[in-house]
């Protein structure tokens, strides 16, 4: 929002017109005077924002977008993951005082991207890790799956400290800990078909015949809602939502116990975002997954996570049940982060709020 506030200020100072391209209708309500809806290369609707929100869209597709954006998520109930049986079990994942630093060569300074973070996740629990860009969320996730080495601390998975393990020692656990990456198009090999991409992780598991492997791939496509006709498609032939689903299918192919979802709803339009949220929630229920959701999408957090942890400058500043954090955050930064979610309502239209500029101060 700081960037948008600055954009509005400069546009006013210089007398500029601005075209804002976005999926976020809250952003449209707060910053725009008119809204245009595009579909399949065509401009299907153009209206003043206040009329669009008050009188409603004239096109069915536009109405679907607005309705999807206004749906209040069904909160996850922390009690589901907090029953006596689960509370008596040791955590599936326990992180203690984790530290990861990076050296900036240009000025020889050291950045503590993850700075003494401790958290735990039990079986069947889902934790959302939120915070602004650069807070250390993705670095944290990469440390958990050993994509990058940690400097110090402890990462215990199923009772084993994975931090000192070599790649070979960690390999047997890699099947049980999977990650869905933020940018699926970058993570997916462009020369492989969907069939090949989903089949590749199966090599980490028990040996399978070609027939069993082919059947498992189709089963996974069904599970994540991808048409079997797309099995021979390449990543560039898929929509962003379909690419996300392929990434999820790859992660689930080896039947993991724990999955890290890095920005699972980023860069998706409102309808597809809702579909991905529903898919992930259904998969959690069906498979009993433990999960870490790394996200900026606070609206989706309420549907996806039992608990929320807030990161800032590499540190964990607040942690608790999702509804308690949303209804009564204890930390000032958390309150500002929640306030930065833009409502889809008429009063914000065209008024160009600038109260969010203080977020990083």
Language-model segments: what does each one mean?
Residues 153-161, 173:
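Conserved ABC transporter NBD signature motif
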Residues 46-48, 316-320:
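ABC ATPase "signature
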Residues 234-238, 242:
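Conserved ABC ATPase signature
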Residues 49-96, 104-110, 322-361:
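Short catalytic/signature loops enriched in Gly
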Residues 253-257:
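A short, proline-enriched helix->beta-strand linker immediately N-terminal to the Walker B motif
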Residues 211-229, 339:
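Conserved ABC ATPase "signature" region
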């Amino acid at each position: 929002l700081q960037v948008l506030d600055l954009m509005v200020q400069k546009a006013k100072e210089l007398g500029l017109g601005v075209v804002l391209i976005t999926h976020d209708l809250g952003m449209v309500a707060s910053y725009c005077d008119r809204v245009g809806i595009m579909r399949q290369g065509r401009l299907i609707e153009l209206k003043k924002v206040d009329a669009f929100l008050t009188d409603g869209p004239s096109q069915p597709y536009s109405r679907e977008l607005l309705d999807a954006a206004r749906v209040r998520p069904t909160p996850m109930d922390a009690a589901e993951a907090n029953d006596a049986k689960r509370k008596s079990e040791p955590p599936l994942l326990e992180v203690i005082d984790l530290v990861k630093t990076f050296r900036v060569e240009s000025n020889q300074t050291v950045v503590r991207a993850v700075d003494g973070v401790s958290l735990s996740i039990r079986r069947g629990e889902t934790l959302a890790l939120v915070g602004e860009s650069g807070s250390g969320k993705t670095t944290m996730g990469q440390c958990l799956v050993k994509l990058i080495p940690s400097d110090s601390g402890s990462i215990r998975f199923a009772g084993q400290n994975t931090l000192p393990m070599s790649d070979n020692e960690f390999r047997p656990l890699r099947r049980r800990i999977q990650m869905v990456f933020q940018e699926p198009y970058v993570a997916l090999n462009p020369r492989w078909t969907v069939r090949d991409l989903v089949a590749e992780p199966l090599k980490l598991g028990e040996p399978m015949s070609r027939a069993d492997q082919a059947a498992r791939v189709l089963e996974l496509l069904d599970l994540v809602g991808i048409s079997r006709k797309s099995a021979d498609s390449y990543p560039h032939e898929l929509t962003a939502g379909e690419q996300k689903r392929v990434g999820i299918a790859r992660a689930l192919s080896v039947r993991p116990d724990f999955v890290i979802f890095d920005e699972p709803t980023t860069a998706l339009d409102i309808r597809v975002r809702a579909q991905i949220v529903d898919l992930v929630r259904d998969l959690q229920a069906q498979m009993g997954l433990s999960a870490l959701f790394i996200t900026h999408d606070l609206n989706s957090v309420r549907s996806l996570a039992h608990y929320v942890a807030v990161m800032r400058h590499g540190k964990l500043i607040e942690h608790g049940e999702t509804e308690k954090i949303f209804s009564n955050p204890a930390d000032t930064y958390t309150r500002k982060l929640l306030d930065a979610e833009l409502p889809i309502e008429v009063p914000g239209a065209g008024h160009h709020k600038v109260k969010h500029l203080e977020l990083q101060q």
